[in-house]
Curated annotation (Swiss-Prot):
Function, in words: The RuvA-RuvB-RuvC complex processes Holliday junction (HJ) DNA during genetic recombination and DNA repair. Endonuclease that resolves HJ intermediates. Cleaves cruciform DNA by making single-stranded nicks across the HJ at symmetrical positions within the homologous arms, yielding a 5'-phosphate and a 3'-hydroxyl group; requires a central core of homology in the junction. The consensus cleavage sequence is 5'-(A/T)TT(C/G)-3'. Cleavage occurs on the 3'-side of the TT dinucleotide at the point of strand exchange.
Main location (coarse class): cytoplasm
EC number from the UniProt entry: 3.1.21.10
Cofactor binding: number and manner: Binds 2 Mg(2+) ion per subunit.
GO terms under cellular component: cytoplasm; Holliday junction resolvase complex
Reactions catalysed: Endonucleolytic cleavage at a junction such as a reciprocal single-stranded crossover between two homologous DNA duplexes (Holliday junction)
InterPro entries, A to Z: RNaseH-like_sf, RNaseH_sf, X-over_junc_endoDNase_Mg_BS, X-over_junc_endoDNase_RuvC
Organism, scientific name: Prochlorococcus marinus (strain MIT 9215)
Known cofactor(s): Mg(2+)
Residues annotated as binding Mg(2+) 1: D7, D139
Protein name: Crossover junction endodeoxyribonuclease RuvC
NCBIfam families: PRK00039.2-1
Length: 157
């Protein structure tokens, strides 16, 4: 089983890919898809589309976990929703099953509290994946937490 966790955004899309082998969680890759702020929005969305397709073609995940987006009154809301739409379209085009989780659900599953701090979530991710160093940048650590939430839901702790 191989899962990709995705933390949506327009400027940065965090991703983390975990494989289960002999009941052990193995971190295969994590990072961010960064889009240039100097580019037009449609070009940034296309960059997410292209780079996510390449990642999926390379790693062939069997399932995906994506953070749910809640509407806040913010100037970036529509851009993030558009980026999330591109992400969901790529996953659907690859016939990858998608599970969605709220930030509170992720924190509760990973760190034991729906109000856990970023550090508490990061520590739990590092413990679960037996990492010596924290994944950088933060968006990739968040994506790993999202993937771990899906694994936990599937009974893989």
């Amino acid at each position: 089983m191989r899962i990709i966790g995705i933390d949506p955004g327009l400027a940065r899309v965090g991703y983390g890919i975990i494989e289960i082998e002999n009941e052990k969680k193995i971190l295969l890759d994590c990072g961010v898809i960064e889009t240039g702020k100097d580019k037009k929005e449609e070009d940034r969305l296309y960059e997410i589309f292209k780079d996510l397709n390449e990642l999926i073609n390379h790693w062939n995940p069997t399932s995906a976990a994506v953070e749910k987006f809640f509407f806040y009154r913010s100037s970036t809301t529509i851009s993030v929703v558009q980026a999330r739409g591109v992400i969901m379209m790529v996953l659907a085009s690859k016939k990858i099953q998608v599970s969605e989780y709220s930030p509170a659900q992720i924190k509760l599953t990973i760190a034991g509290s729906g109000k856990a701090s970023k550090k508490e979530v990061l520590d739990a991710v590092m413990f679960s994946l037996e990492l010596k160093k924290p994944p950088k940048p933060d968006d990739s650590a968040d994506a790993l937490a999202i993937a771990l939430t899906k694994l936990n839901e599937d009974g893989i702790n």
